[in-house]
């Protein structure tokens, strides 16, 4: 089962998610690189990445891509959205890949998260995230849609599966990037709004039926990244749609904005419940009979992150990184890897990624030029 540790920081947010079956084929994505990305080494030893092409490999298991222009999401919503990941992929096949029907499917699997929201000494906010899973192929995706906010998000490409009988070479970069737009697990947009998905280990699921346009877990994340500037706007948007949990896994959302507002959005008996909190892991926070249900490890990670906030109410990017490190896989041993850790700067609009618990090397992305 994936594990994601999410910490909401008033300056940055930290999130971690995911777990996949062992033995992932890391060579499948991307298939051959063209010209390398532009990069420069910064004073903090981060590598600044300028994404110039659709998919470029940064290191084994971590790639970056960019999409600009019409992403089809407005048409997706106006057509009624989707109740399942299969319906999402059918929309993409019909809209973008009519000649490649059945080329791929989406296979979202169980995951968990921890997030933290905190303020820095300049009064800005950071958001941090860990994604814990087995080894996988991750894509950092810069999106600049025609009718929405630009954003950076992270996608587990192993959730996007090849259809039966399709060779990997037939899954072009174009197809993978389009599919990835509809499968983000976390991200930040140009307004500084951060979103992360966290799993809750509970037999209950989410299947709202109020006659509204339907969204899956990951398309809800895309909706917020494209259209919400603040937590209040995000909550208003979520209330306008019927949410359906991907693969029937119970999830909750960590959402934080550039003004320091941070909330957990949970669904109890298909009713949306909002709890203001700087820390979120993998158990219910909402008051009531569900409160506390989740893994014992998620309670431990929550306590660690809460303690870090108590000790340091104001944090630097390095402090957030260290907080994420403190709840990474090596401290618990339950999962194969913390696949990625992110520190989002909600004022500078940068995202600093650490891959597979190598906290001495990072990649820095900027949403806007």
Q: What does each model-found stretch correspond to?
A:
Residues 7, 28, 282-283:
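Intrinsic disorder/low-structure terminal segments
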Residues 3-13:
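Bacterial N-terminal signal peptides
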Residues 12-222, 226, 316-369:
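N-terminal mature-domain region immediately after signal-peptide cleavage
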């Amino acid at each position: 089962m994936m594990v994601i540790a999410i910490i909401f920081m008033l300056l940055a947010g930290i999130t971690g998610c995911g777990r996949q079956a062992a033995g992932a084929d890391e060579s499948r994505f991307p298939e051959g690189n063209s010209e390398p990305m532009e990069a420069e080494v910064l004073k903090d030893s981060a590598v600044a990445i300028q994404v110039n092409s659709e998919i470029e490999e940064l290191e084994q298991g971590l790639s970056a891509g960019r999409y600009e222009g019409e992403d089809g999401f407005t048409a997706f919503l106006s057509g009624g959205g989707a109740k399942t990941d299969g319906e999402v992929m059918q929309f993409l096949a019909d809209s973008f890949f009519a000649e490649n029907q059945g080329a791929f499917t989406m296979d979202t699997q169980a995951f968990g998260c921890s997030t933290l929201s905190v303020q820095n000494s300049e009064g800005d906010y950071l958001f941090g995230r860990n994604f814990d899973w087995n080894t996988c192929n991750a894509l950092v995706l810069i999106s600049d849609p025609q009718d929405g906010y630009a954003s950076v998000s992270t996608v587990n490409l192993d959730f996007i599966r090849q259809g039966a009988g399709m060779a990997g070479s037939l899954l072009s970069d174009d197809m993978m990037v389009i599919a990835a737009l509809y499968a983000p697990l976390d991200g930040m947009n140009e307004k500084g709004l951060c979103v992360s998905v966290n799993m809750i280990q509970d037999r209950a699921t989410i299947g709202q039926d109020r006659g509204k346009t339907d969204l899956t877990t990951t398309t809800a994340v895309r909706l917020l990244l494209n259209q919400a500037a603040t937590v209040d706007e995000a909550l208003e948007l979520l209330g306008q749609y019927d949410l359906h949990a991907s693969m029937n896994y119970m999830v909750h959302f960590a959402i934080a904005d550039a003004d320091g507002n941070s909330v957990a959005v949970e669904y109890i008996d298909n009713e949306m419940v909002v709890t203001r909190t700087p820390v979120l892991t993998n158990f219910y926070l909402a008051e009531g009979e569900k409160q506390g249900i989740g893994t014992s490890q998620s309670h431990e990670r929550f306590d660690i992150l809460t303690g870090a906030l108590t000790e340091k109410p104001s944090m630097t990017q390095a402090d957030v990184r260290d907080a994420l490190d403190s709840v990474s896989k090596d401290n618990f041993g339950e999962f194969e890897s913390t696949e990625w850790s992110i520190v989002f700067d909600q004022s500078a609009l940068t995202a600093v990624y650490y891959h597979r618990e190598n906290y001495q090397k990072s990649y820095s992305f900027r949403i806007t030029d």
